[in-house]
């Protein structure tokens, strides 16, 4: 999708469609939908339809007017943004996605989006607004129906953002939005592929190709390296599969980076999770192709980081393998020695994510990472706790949490902190080894995080359980159902926050 800025008055922009935001300023029984444009010609064009009460400004209400009077655009799209009081850049991002999804389904290929500029209501900084619109438009332009023979792949080819302000700053914001939006779609593309088309080896290849394009260092190692590093927990999972595992390392080492800070991003890359010997029921097992979403998120985040060039050192480690039952597979009761030296009693081979991450976290620390973030589709229990809305967030350090929460707020993604009290340690006690890999069902997401905490040790660490949020169960106005690319935006903001 081509993107460009226009500094004309919205009413003077020649386009197939001009999209504008309508907000609900109503109080008590007094309805008041206001077109967020300082251009009176645009407001006049929408006056009649607003007067009928048909347009209220409620969230994701879309009204398409043809041949609107007094403006140059062929159509005017009124996008309801909800209550004016709560409107923010996060809503604007979704509205841009909704505009794209509405218009591309009508075979429109190019349109213009007017930055809400009345300001009275939104108070969104112009640069943040442009970035949000571009990100949202890219997210909305992605469809996952790759393998349909009659795939239409309708897309928006060109987006013009009508804005006011400092051209250089707005161009930068647009570039940032493009990089982050495209990187999120890159992640979604990886996650979307089925396991026969995204084996650990293929994930490694995709990471390598991307790294070469954006100038990152990349290494992809196989089973020999796992054994050399004594990654007994990772190998325990990988040993049951005929597909070789891949230990993927991406390095971003800018000049003039912040001293003494080395961020480590660790991603779960299970390209298919059958459960292993503790096999999953057939019902819904096909979804376990997205069990590499955490890894794909880290690969996509590294792409964005390489292009945005924040001055902070970042290393990503992705643990990619299948989790399969076979004559070589690990069995319940087996004991594995993790890279850190800790012994793990395998209670349930389906609790494999924490095993691969244990060695990933340990390796990141060995490589000198000073701060760690992991992302993983780790537990069904996090879906029970938080549904399909919030990412489960855990932290072993409040300062690290505060930093991450700030970045998360800027990114506008739903995340919710869950506890890690020492009292939960009971749940991962083993009678024959240091810890078990699967505790009781209650508090399942926390038990998994407690397990990981043992391997983050004293390094400040954030764990993101994205099992409920990495895959959208339904179409939304702004995003297609399927892989969401969740957490990437927060991660990129977090990394940028450390730059000197
Ligand atoms: N990959 C799953 C978790 C998952 C569930 C991801 C639903 C996405 C949607 C993970 O490896 C798993 O199987 N976890 C088990 C752990 C249990 C055996 C302790 C679970 O949540 O049931
Ligand atoms: Mn599993
Ligand atoms: Zn899994």
Model-derived regions, located:
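A generic structural signal for tightly packed, nonpolar segments enriched in small/aliphatic residues
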Residues: 55, 204-500
């Amino acid at each position: 999708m081509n993107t460009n800025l226009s500094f004309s008055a919205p009413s003077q922009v020649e386009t197939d469609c001009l999209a504008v935001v309508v907000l609900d300023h109503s109080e008590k029984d007094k309805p008041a939908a206001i077109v967020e444009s300082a251009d009176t010609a645009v407001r006049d064009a929408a006056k009649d339809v607003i007067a009928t009460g048909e347009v209220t400004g409620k969230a994701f209400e879309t009204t398409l007017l043809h041949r609107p009077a007094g403006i140059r655009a062929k159509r005017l799209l009124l996008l309801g943004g909800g209550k004016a009081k709560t409107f923010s850049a996060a809503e604007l991002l979704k509205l841009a996605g909704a505009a794209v999804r509405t218009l591309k389904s009508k075979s429109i290929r190019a349109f213009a989006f007017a930055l809400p500029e009345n300001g009275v209501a939104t108070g969104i900084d112009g640069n943040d607004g442009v970035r949000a619109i571009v990100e949202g438009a890219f997210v909305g332009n992605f469809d996952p129906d790759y393998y349909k023979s009659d795939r239409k792949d309708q897309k928006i080819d060109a987006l013009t953002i009508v804005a006011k302000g400092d051209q250089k700053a707005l161009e930068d914001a647009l570039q940032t939005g493009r990089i982050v939006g495209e990187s999120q779609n890159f992640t979604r593309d990886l996650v979307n592929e089925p396991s026969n088309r995204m084996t650990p080896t293929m994930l490694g290849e995709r990471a390598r190709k991307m790294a070469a394009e954006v100038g990152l260092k990349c290494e992809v190692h196989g089973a020999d390296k796992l054994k050399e590093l004594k990654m007994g927990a990772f190998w325990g999972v990988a040993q049951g599969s005929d597909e070789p595992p891949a230990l993927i390392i991406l390095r971003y080492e800018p000049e003039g980076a912040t001293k003494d800070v080395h961020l480590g991003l660790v991603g779960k890359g299970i390209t298919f999770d059958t459960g292993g010997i503790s096999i999953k029921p057939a019902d819904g097992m096909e979804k376990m192709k997205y069990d590499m979403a955490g890894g794909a998120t880290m690969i996509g985040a590294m792409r964005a980081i390489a292009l945005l060039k924040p001055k902070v050192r970042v290393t990503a480690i992705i643990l990619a393998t299948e989790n399969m039952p076979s004559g070589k597979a690990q069995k319940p009761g087996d004991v594995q020695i993790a890279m850190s030296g800790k012994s793990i009693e395998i209670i349930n081979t389906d609790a494999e994510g924490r095993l691969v991450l244990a060695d990933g976290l340990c390796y990141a620390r060995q490589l000198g990472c000073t701060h760690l973030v992991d992302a993983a589709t780790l537990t069904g229990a996090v879906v029970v706790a938080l549904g399909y809305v919030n990412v489960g967030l855990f932290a072993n350090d409040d300062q690290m949490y505060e930093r991450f929460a700030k970045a998360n707020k800027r990114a506008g993604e739903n995340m919710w902190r869950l506890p890690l009290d020492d009292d939960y340690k009971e749940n991962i006690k083993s009678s024959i080894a240091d810890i078990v890999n699967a505790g009781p069902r209650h508090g399942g997401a926390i038990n998994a995080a407690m397990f990981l905490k043992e391997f983050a040790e004293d390094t400040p660490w954030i764990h993101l359980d994205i099992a409920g949020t990495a895959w959208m169960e339904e179409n939304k106005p702004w995003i297609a159902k399927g892989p969401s690319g969740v957490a990437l935006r927060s991660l990129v903001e977090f990394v940028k926050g450390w730059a000197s």
